[in-house]
Amino acid sequence: MVVFLGRHLPALLEVFKKGSAKAESDNRQGAGPSQGPGSVGDELQDNVFFPSGRPPHLEELHTQAQEGLRSLQHQERQKLSKGGWDHGDTQSIQSSQTGPDEDTISIYSQKSYMTESSTAEDALSVRSEMIQRRGSTFRPHDSFPKSGKSGRRRRERRSTVLGLPQHVQKELGLRNNREAPGTPQPPGSRDAVRIPTVDGRPGLALGTGVRVSLQALEAETEAGTDAEAVIQRHIDRVYHDDTLVGRSTGARPPPLTRPMSLAVPGLTGGAGSPEPLSPAMSISPQATYLSKLIPHAVLPPTVDVVALGRSSLRTLSRCSLLSASPASVRSLGRFSSASSPRPRSRNASSSSDNWSHSQSSETIVSDGSTLSSKGGSEGQPEGSVASNNVAPPPPGGSGRGSPSGGSTAETSDTASIRSSGQLSGRSVSLRKMKRPPPPPRRTYSLHQRGSAVPDGPLGLPPKPERKQQPQLPRPPTAGGSSGVGAVSCPPSSAGTWGSGLSPGGSRRPPRSPERTLSPSSGYSSQSGTPTLPPKGLAVAPASPGKAQPPKPDRVTSLRSPGASVSSSLTSLCSSSSDPTPLDRSGPQMSTPLSDRFVIPPHPKVPAPFSPPPSKSKSSNQAAPVLAAPAVAPGQVSTIDTSPASPSMPQTTLTPAQESPVASKDESPPPSPPPSYHPPPPPTKKPEVLEEAPPPPEAAVEILPDPSWPPPPPPAPEEQDLSMADFPPPEEVFFNAGPELGPLESCSSEAAVPPAASLSQTPPPAPPPSSGSEPLARLPQKDSVGKHSGAPREDSGTPLVTPSLLQMVRLRSVGASTGIPNPSPGSSAPQKPLRRALSGRASPVTAPSSGLHAAVRLKASSLAASESPASALPTGIPEAEPRSPQSPASKASFIFSKGTKKLQLERPVSPEAQADLQRNLVAELRSISEHRPPPQAQKKPSKAPPPVARKPSVGVPPPSPSLPRTESLTAPSTNGLPHAEDRTNGELAENGGVQLAATEKMGSPGSDPQKKLV
C-alpha cells in the first residue's frame, strides 16, 4: 500500500489538486454573486481541517504530512521485519573490536546494508526526494536519508572509538589484540582514524602516551638531581626542535626528534621507568590550552609543572622568569607564590614576590598589573620598600603618584586589598574601580589605616606595607597618613602606626606631593584640586610633622583622609566619624604619625607657635585616638576651633567618635554642649566671634606656620595634651574635647599629627590661645560634647551646618580667596588639616598649593602676624598653621566652606581679619556657649566636598577640621560681620569639627563661599 501510494503519488496529488480546485471554483462561483467581496473572508473562515474547504496549498501540506507519516511507519516496520540494521550494527561493533581493518569492515557492512535498504525503500526515497524537490515546507522523514544519517553517525562513533588513547585502552585492558604490541603502525597506514599519542610515538608498553608522564623527570629527581635543572634540561630537550611539533600526520618523526608537547612534556622520553613512578596526574599551567599541539609553541618561562603523585604532590618544574612580561610575571608570581615558598629567580619577582609574601599569588597578579602600570622598576621599589619597611617607599614617592598603577595603582589594589583586609592585590581594573570608591573606601581604608600613616593614600603604601607588615602598616597608614580614614578606626591602628608608620610616614611625605595628583583620582582633585598644590602644601604641612602632607599628593585621593586629601575622603571620614574632622583640622590626618616623623624632615617653615596645651588638650582626646603626641597641640587649638564647628555637623559622626572623646574628656563636654547648644544657630555667629579668638590663635599659630619646623617641640605638648595631660584646661577641653575627642577619635589618628604640627607651630600663640582657646574650647567642647554627648543638639545647629557646608564648598572652590581670609585663624587651622590630609588641599600653604595655597598662605601669614600681636590672631594663626598644611587646609576650605567662612574669606584685609578675630575672641569668651554654631560650621566643612559628603560620616571628620580652619581663616580675612567672625572662631576652635559643621551647615555661608570660589 505504501509503495503503491509512493509510486503513484504524483498522479494522486494531481487528482487531489484538481478536485480541490474544482471545489473551490464552485464554491467561489456559488458564493461570489451573493457575497462578492466577502467571499475571500469566507474562504479564510472555512474550517481548514474539513477536506472540502481546504485551499490547494493546505491540501498539499496535508498530503506531504501523510506521506511523511507513512514513510516513518514503513521504516519502523522494516526495522522490525529486517535484521539488516541490526546485522550491520553487530558487524560494525564486532569489527571495531576485531582489528585494524575494523573500520573498513564496518563501512562495507553499512554499504551493503544501504544498498539493500535503498532497493527496498526505493519508492520511499523517490517519493521523499520528489516532495523535497517540490520545496515543500514539510519534509517527511524520508527513511533513506534517515538511514544514511544514522549509518553515518554510527560510523563516526566507531571512528572515535577507534581513536581511544592507547593508555586508556591499556587501562581498560583493551590493549591492541589486533596488533603486535611491539610493532606500532604509522598513523596513516590504515583507514581507521587513529589519534596519535600526544608525544607522537606509538602507544607502546612504555607507559607513555597521552598521559602526562613525568616519569623520567621523577626518576632523575629521585636520583637526587636538582628538579629545576632536570626540568630545564627536559624543556630544552623537548623544545630544541619546535618545527616538528605540528607534524603529527604523515610519517611520524622519530620519537627523539619530535618535541613533546608542553602539556605532555616528553618527560616520558626515558619512558622505561615502571608505571608506579608515573604521577597519578600531573598538571601544567599550559595543559589547559594544549588540546592541540601548537607548532612553534614554547613552554612559557612562567609555567610550573606540578606532579600530583599517588602519594605526594610536588612541583616538578618551576620556570624561573629571568625576563618576563608583566603578564607572565604575574602568572609566574601567582604560580610561584602559590606553588613554592622559594622566590622566583626572575627580577620582576622581587616586586611580585614581595607582594606575594604577604598576599597570595593573586597579589602577584595585581602586581603584574602594577608592573605594567607602575613600570617594573617603580613598582618594584615600592614593593621592595614596602617589603623592607613601609617607611622606605620614598622611592615610590613619585612612583606613588605614578604607581597609581604600581604603587598607587597598587594603592588602589592596596586600598581594595586593604578594604578586603589582606586580599591579594587587585588587578589594575580593580585599581581603577577603587578610585571612585575611594571616598567610601578611603574612609574605610583610612579608618583601617588610620594608624598606618605611611599609606597616605588609601592603600597606597599599605599595599607594599601590607606585604611587609600588612596589618600594622595598614593601620598606621590610616592613622598617620589617612588620619581621616584611620580616624574612626585607627586609634589603635594609629598607635601601631606610630611605631610602624613613622617610616611609612617619612616615606609617604615624599610621595605625597606627587601622589596628590594621582591620588586625587578624582576625589583628591575634588577636595582641593590641589592635586599638585598638595605637594607644596604637603611640604608646609610636612614641616609641622606632616610627613603626611607629602602623602597628601597621593594621599590626596587615597590619603585624603589624612589631610582631607580628598574632599570625598573628608566627607567619608567626617560622616564616618565627626572626630575625624577635628583631627583633620588640628592634626591633618596625614600628619599624625607621618607628620610627627616626617615633619622634622621637610617641615614647612611656617610653623606658627604650637598652640598651647589647650590644643594639646583638644588633642588629648585625639591623641588617645592615634597620634595624640603630634596632633594634640595643633589639634587642640585647631581642633578646638574646628571641633566646635565640626561637632555639630559631625553630630552623626561625632556621637560615635565622641563617645571615645567623651570618655577621654569625660561627660563634661557633653553637658557643656547642651548649655551651649541652644545658642548654636544664633550663637553660631556670635560663637564665631567668640571663637574668633581661637581663630586668632590659629592665626598666630599659622603665622608661625611658615616655621612649621618648630612644631616638633609643640608635638610633645600635643602629645601631653593628647594624653589629656592638661587636666586644668580639661574642662574647657572637655567641653570642646568631646567633640574634639570624637573628631579626633576618628580624625585624631589622621589629624592628630597635623594638629600636633599646628599646636607645635603655634606655641607662641598658645598663651593667648590658651586663654581664649579654653573659652573657645569650651564652646567647642560644648559643640563637641553636643556632638558626642548631645549630637542631636548639634544637629539643632543645622543652620550653621548648611551654611558652613556651602561655605566649605565655596572654600574649596575659592581656596585662594579663602586662604588669605582663613589666615586670620579659623581657616588656618582647618586648612592645615586639609592640606595635610590632601596634599593638593594645601591651598592654605600658598607655596605648595596653587592659587588657593598662595591665597591661604597669604591669609595665614596675615593672620599669623596679627595673631602674634594679639590673642585674636592666635586663633587664626592656628588656622594658618593648618594653612601651611595647605593640603589639609585646602581640603578644609573645600570641606569647611561656610557662609560665614566665605564672607570672612572675602574680606581678606588683615585688619578686618584682626578685628574679626578680636571680636571673635571677645565673643568666644563671652559666648563660649555658642559652640553649636561652630558645630554648624563644622557641618559646612563637611558639605564642601560632595564626594566627601557622600562619605560624610567618614570623610568630614578628617576634612572638617581643615575646612574649619579654612573657614575660620576665611572669615577673618573676609572681615565678615561677627557672624562670619564667629564662623571663623568656630572654625578655629573647632578646626576639624568645623569642617563637618561647615559642610553640613554651609547653607548660610554657601553663597559667600561660592563667591569665593
Swiss-Prot record:
The modification Phosphoserine is found at residues 92, 136, 143, 159, 213, 320, 325, 328, 336-337, 339-340, 398, 402, 407, 543, 610, 667, 671, 838, 842, 848, 909, 952, 959. Residues 600-614, 668-683, 706-716, 942-961 have a biased composition (Pro residues). Residues 20-195, 330-1013 are annotated as: Disordered. It comes from the Eukaryota. The modification Phosphothreonine is found at residues 160, 529, 591. Residues 336-361, 484-493, 515-530, 564-577, 615-633, 859-873 have a biased composition (Low complexity). Residues 73-89, 168-178, 779-795 have a biased composition (Basic and acidic residues). Keywords: Methylation, Phosphoprotein. The modification Phosphotyrosine is found at residue 108. InterPro entries: NHS-like. The modification Asymmetric dimethylarginine is found at residue 318. Residues 90-99, 106-120, 362-375, 408-427, 635-657, 814-829, 964-975 have a biased composition (Polar residues). Disulfide bonds: none annotated. Able to directly activate the TNF-NFkappaB signaling pathway. This is NHS-like protein 3.
